[in-house]
């Protein structure tokens, strides 16, 4: 069946941008049972095993006042081959006429894999590049060098076969080390990078060509957000366009969200208002190390000035509460210290840990009845023993050597062969954050 339902091989020259869709028409000579509409149901029931059962192909067609029911590929026109005894008997007993039927499958029928298998050079099927990451209306591909001569045709096929996709792009270089953005080329569709992406019950709007976004991290975003409790204060040091900050804000978590990329900051501000979390999420545009140090006083001042954030239940729930004479507002105290620091810049976030040295110097009293903050730092690792490597790197930056039991090493995903992404979670030691800052 796999070989049968496949378009004919098509020779494709490199760097073509358009496909001749007529090349993908394929006609099958089949046999159909001609019956009255009243008998279709009974025939379907009795002859079920002998009917044509191809994916996305209907087996009943109208012809004048009668129905043509397609039989399986092996059925002969005289009914002597390819049919079960039950079907043969049913046809004879009901004087059903068998007629030839030509079924034509065209470009619209075939899936992207089918088309690419037909036009790309011979190779392992799973190697043909039909996979992509969807970001809003954009399909983001990362084509290997061997497929670059066929990149425009590949893009065209992906565009044609995915109705929600309007633009197909290919990454043309490695991620920029400063802002995690990368150069991309439009392979097919419109030249429009402004996307709206849904994730974690939030909407995010941004220019995909100017900011970092990875839809494959949605599970990791949700994992950390679930650890934040209403009324917690979270410092999102490398916040991007807000995938941690905005959903956390919807949970009534106070978030100070920062990103150095001015385009990310601009989108972050927009997304805060788009998701109606401005009371809980504050946006900043600073260097990460500088922000870690300055955010302590920012939150302390915010806590003293505002004291609490008032929230109201949704209107429908508010009406029910009013009927029950329950309060319809809630005051959420603003804590003076952060419960969590999120550092989602896996290429270099560990190097920013030195900024925590002395960040709460002279403020020990704030933690009299509070736990010390947790840090969630994302990082890449290329070593077979990730725990040893990551502990050494944390020590080199923070100046504190954790035991393996003091750090949660969470495996996030494989980024490339011999390159994995982890999230290291640990509690900041008092000996580090309360230490007297070293001048100069």
Swiss-Prot record:
Its EC number is 2.1.1.228
Report which gene this protein is encoded by.
Answer: trm5
**What does the annotation say about its assembly with partners?**
Monomer.
Q: Which Pfam families did the record assign?
A: TRM5-TYW2_MTfase (PF02475), TYW2_N_2 (PF25133)
Q: Which family does it belong to?
A: Belongs to the class I-like SAM-binding methyltransferase superfamily. TRM5/TYW2 family.
UniProt main location, coarse:
mitochondrion
Q: What class of enzyme is it?
A: transferase
What GO molecular-function term can you cite, just one?
tRNA (guanine(37)-N1)-methyltransferase activity
Instruction: Give the GO cellular component terms, alphabetically.
Output: cytoplasm; mitochondrial matrix; nucleus
Task: Recite the lineage of the species.
Answer: Eukaryota, Fungi, Dikarya, Ascomycota, Taphrinomycotina
Summarize where S-adenosyl-L-methionine binds, as residue positions.
221, 259-260, 287-288, 344
The entry's protein name is: tRNA (guanine(37)-N(1))-methyltransferase
Q: Which HAMAP family match?
A: TRM5
The compartments listed are: Mitochondrion matrix; Nucleus; Cytoplasm
Instruction: Write out the catalysed reaction.
Output: guanosine(37) in tRNA + S-adenosyl-L-methionine = N(1)-methylguanosine(37) in tRNA + S-adenosyl-L-homocysteine + H(+)
Keywords in alphabetical order: Cytoplasm, Methyltransferase, Mitochondrion, Nucleus, S-adenosyl-L-methionine, Transferase, tRNA processing
């Amino acid at each position: 069946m796999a070989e049968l339902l496949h378009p004919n091989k098509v020779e494709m020259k490199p760097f073509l941008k358009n496909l001749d869709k007529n090349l993908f028409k394929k006609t099958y000579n089949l046999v159909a049972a001609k019956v009255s509409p009243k008998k279709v149901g009974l025939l379907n029931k009795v002859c079920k095993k002998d009917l044509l059962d191809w994916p996305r192909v209907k087996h009943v067609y109208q012809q004048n006042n009668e129905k043509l029911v397609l039989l399986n590929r092996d059925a002969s026109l005289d009914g002597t081959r390819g049919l079960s005894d039950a079907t043969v008997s049913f046809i004879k007993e009901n004087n059903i006429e068998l007629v030839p039927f030509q079924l034509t499958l065209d470009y619209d029928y075939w899936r992207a894999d089918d088309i690419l298998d037909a036009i790309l050079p011979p190779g392992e099927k799973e190697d043909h590049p039909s996979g992509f990451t969807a970001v809003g209306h954009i399909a983001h591909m990362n084509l290997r060098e061997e497929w670059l001569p066929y990149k425009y045709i590949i893009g065209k096929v992906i565009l044609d076969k995915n109705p929600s996709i309007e633009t197909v792009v290919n990454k043309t270089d490695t991620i920029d080390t400063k802002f995690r953005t990368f150069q991309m080329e439009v392979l097919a569709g419109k030249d429009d990078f402004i996307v709206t992406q849904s994730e974690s019950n939030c909407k995010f709007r941004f220019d995909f060509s100017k900011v970092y976004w990875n839809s494959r991290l949605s599970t990791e975003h949700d994992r950390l957000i679930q650890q934040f409790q209403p009324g917690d204060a979270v410092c999102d040091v490398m916040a991007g366009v807000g995938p941690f900050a905005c959903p956390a804000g919807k949970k009534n978590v106070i978030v100070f969200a920062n990103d150095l990329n001015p385009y990310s900051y601009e989108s972050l501000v927009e997304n805060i208002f788009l998701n109606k979390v401005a009371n809980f999420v504050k946006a900043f545009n600073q260097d990460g190390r500088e922000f870690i140090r300055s955010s302590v006083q920012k939150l302390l001042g915010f806590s003293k000035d505002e004291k609490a954030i008032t929230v109201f239940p949704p209107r429908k729930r508010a009406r029910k509460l009013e009927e029950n004479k329950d309060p319809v507002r809630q005051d959420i105290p603003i804590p003076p210290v952060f419960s969590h620091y999120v550092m989602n810049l896996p290429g270099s976030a560990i190097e920013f840990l030195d900024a925590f040295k002395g960040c709460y110097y002279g403020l020990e009293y704030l933690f009299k009845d509070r736990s010390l903050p947790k840090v969630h730092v994302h990082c890449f690792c290329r070593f077979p023993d990730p725990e040893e490597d990551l502990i050494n790197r944390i020590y080199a930056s923070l100046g504190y050597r954790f035991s393996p039991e003091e750090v949660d090493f969470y495996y996030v995903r494989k980024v490339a062969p011999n390159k994995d992404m982890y999230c290291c979670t640990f509690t900041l030691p008092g000996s580090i954050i309360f230490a007297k800052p070293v001048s100069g």
